[in-house]
Structures are given as C-alpha cells and as structure tokens.
C-alpha cells in the first residue's frame, strides 16, 4: 500500500510538473506574441511618424518654391515699374527738348523785330505821338509773350563781364571803374531758360 501511494504521489508530482511546464510554455508563447504585437505596433507608429515627416517636408518645399516664385515675380514687377518710370521721364525730357528747340527758333527770328522796335522808339522824339504809343504797346505785348515762353533779357549793365553771357566788342579805360566791368550795352542779349539765345553785345572797361 505504501508503495502504491508512493507511486501515486510520483505520478501526481510528474503531472504537476508537466502542467507547470505547459503553463510556463503558454506564458512564454503569450509573451512572445505580446512582444511581436508591441514591435508591430511600434513599427506602425514609426511608419506613421515617417509619413507625417515626409508630408511636412513636402509641404515646406512646396511653400518655399511658391515663395521663391512670388519673390521672382515681385522683382520682375519692380523692374518693369522702374523701366516704365525711366521711359516716361525720357519721353517727357524729349518733349521738353523738342519744345525748347522749336521755341528757340521762333525766338531767334523775333529778337531782330524787337531790336527794330526799340530803335524806332529811341528815335521817336514825341513820346505822346500816336505812332510811338502804338509801337510801344506792340513791343510790350511781344516782350510779355516771350517771357511766358521762358525768355528773359540777360543782365549786363554795370555787371562784371561773363564770357558765357556777354560778347565784348569794345574796351575802354574808365576812371573809377574796375577792369572787366561792363560800361555800355550795345545790343541786348536774351536767354531761354538757361540757354543763351543771343549774348549781350557790350563795351568793357580795361
């Protein structure tokens, strides 16, 4: 009986050991499965992160490309604006130059007429004469018209001689007058803006 009991106990111990080994094997298998699941989940998470990074990079690249194109278009627009402004300025300058040259030709033709009127006025002794008054009126109107177009008489009387404005045709030593001073205007000079149309003809002290 004792021997049978011992055998029974041995069998029970063996069964218990087998059961424990089976449970341990199952637990190990479960751990492996769990680890594989966790690894798979981590890989999935990593893939999602990588996809998000790629999407973010592509978005930034597209944004930078768009900004570069916008900057290039803005630069072209500013250059076109500058070129157009330069074109308008050149066109305006050309118009003004053409206008000045056209006016200069007319003025050059009118100046001798003014000279003739002034000689006639100087020669007239009776300032109350109808002829004198008529010539004087026309002379004034002509001078006023030329002034509107930018014509002005060159100052010369008692001024220092300037070869850019005056033409010296005579020299004379005058007491009390420094050298190179204009002592007499023989013919009036005129300029259109800054351009001399006709220099003043003068006598200069020496």
Swiss-Prot record:
Main location (coarse class): cytoplasm
Compositional bias per record (Basic and acidic residues), positions renumbered to this chain: 1-14
Annotated segments matching region Disordered: 1-56
BP terms from Gene Ontology: protein folding
Keyword list, A-Z: Chaperone, Cytoplasm, Stress response
Subcellular location: Cytoplasm
Gene Ontology molecular function: adenyl-nucleotide exchange factor activity; protein homodimerization activity; protein-folding chaperone binding; unfolded protein binding
Gene3D superfamilies: 3.90.20.20, Head domain of nucleotide exchange factor GrpE
Listed Acidic residues bias regions: 24-39
GO cellular component: a single term: cytoplasm
Keyword Cell division part of the UniProt annotation: no
Paired cysteines (S-S): none
Subunit composition and interactions: Homodimer.
General function of this protein: Participates actively in the response to hyperosmotic and heat shock by preventing the aggregation of stress-denatured proteins, in association with DnaK and GrpE. It is the nucleotide exchange factor for DnaK and may function as a thermosensor. Unfolded proteins bind initially to DnaJ; upon interaction with the DnaJ-bound protein, DnaK hydrolyzes its bound ATP, resulting in the formation of a stable complex. GrpE releases ADP from DnaK; ATP binding to DnaK triggers the release of the substrate protein, thus completing the reaction cycle.
Family note: Belongs to the GrpE family.
The protein's name: Protein GrpE
Organism in which the protein naturally occurs: Clostridioides difficile (strain 630)
Taxonomic classification: Bacteria, Bacillati, Bacillota, Clostridia, Peptostreptococcales
């Amino acid at each position: 009986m004792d021997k049978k009991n011992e055998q029974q106990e041995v069998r029970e111990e063996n069964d218990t050991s087998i059961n424990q080994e089976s449970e341990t094997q199952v637990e190990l298998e479960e751990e492996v499965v769990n680890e594989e699941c966790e690894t798979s989940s981590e890989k999935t998470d990593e893939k999602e992160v990588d996809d998000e990074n790629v999407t973010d990079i592509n978005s930034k690249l597209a944004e930078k490309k768009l900004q570069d194109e916008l900057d290039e278009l803005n630069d072209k627009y500013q250059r076109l604006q500058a070129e157009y402004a330069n074109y308008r300025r050149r066109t305006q300058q050309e118009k003004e130059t053409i206008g000045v040259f056209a006016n200069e030709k007319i003025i050059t033709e009118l100046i001798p007429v003014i000279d003739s009127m002034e000689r006639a006025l100087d020669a007239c002794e009776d300032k109350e004469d109808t002829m004198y008054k008529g010539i004087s009126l026309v002379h004034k109107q002509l001078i006023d018209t030329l002034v509107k177009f930018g014509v002005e008489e060159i100052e010369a009387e008692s001024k220092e001689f300037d070869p850019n404005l005056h033409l010296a045709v005579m020299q004379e030593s005058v007491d009390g007058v420094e050298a190179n001073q204009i002592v007499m205007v023989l013919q009036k000079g005129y300029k259109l803006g800054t351009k001399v149309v006709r220099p003043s003809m003068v006598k200069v002290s020496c």
